[in-house]
Design a protein with these regions (language model features):
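TRNA-recognition modules of translation machinery and tRNA-sensing kinases, especially anticodon-binding
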Residues: 1-183
């Protein structure tokens, strides 16, 4: 994926407070360094109407990510967990609205199975609505035991944003009756 994205994509995938707290803006340009490749993967569909018969689209990406990590963080959060550049794997699904929660569940179960297959002690946490980012409908975290820190640390999260990004990016599909709907 590209390492930078245009402002219209950034505004389509996240709220302004999140953007201000996370994103590095390129001075004098309408460009931002990516905070996650998820944004560029979904952003590639801006202003598109997809063929509903070809949904779902499942995509994955591994990329460097750049974040301000603005805010007051404790000493325990220094190092690999609160750095300005890191590598990250992302998965997204573009699907019909009625399939969204099933895909969320599949991605979540696959993620849990992956960490369990490594025989790492893990626990699953469903995020309460007060902890969700502005556009998220539902989100869960996987935490794995860190022997070095002697505590569980977040290693994965899975979220669904409902139609929030599709609405903001104008990402649609034509159904079997030729009707245009949000993806």
């Amino acid at each position: 994926p590209p390492f930078m994205m245009h402002g219209d994509v950034v505004k389509g995938v996240m709220s302004f407070p999140e953007m201000d707290a996370m994103m590095y803006k390129i001075e004098g340009e309408d460009l931002y360094l990516i905070g996650t490749s998820e944004h560029t993967m979904i952003g590639r569909f801006i202003d598109q109407t997809l063929d509903g018969a070809k949904l779902p689209l499942t995509l994955t990406s591994y990329s460097p990510c750049f974040r301000k990590e603005k805010g007051a963080h404790g000493i325990e959060e220094r190092g690999i967990y609160r750095i300005h550049q890191f590598e990250k794997q992302e998965m997204i699904v573009v699907c019909k609205p009625e399939d969204s929660m099933d895909w969320y569940d599949k991605l979540w179960k696959n993620s849990v199975e992956l960490f369990r297959s490594m025989e790492s002690p893990v626990r699953q946490l469903e995020c309460c609505s007060g902890d969700l980012a502005d556009l998220k409908v539902k989100s869960c975290d996987i935490e794995a035991w860190s022997p070095r820190q002697q505590k569980y640390i977040e290693v994965c999260s899975c979220s669904t944003l409902g139609d929030a990004q599709a609405r903001r990016l104008r990402l649609r599909f034509k159904d079997e009756n030729g009707k245009t709907q949000l993806a």
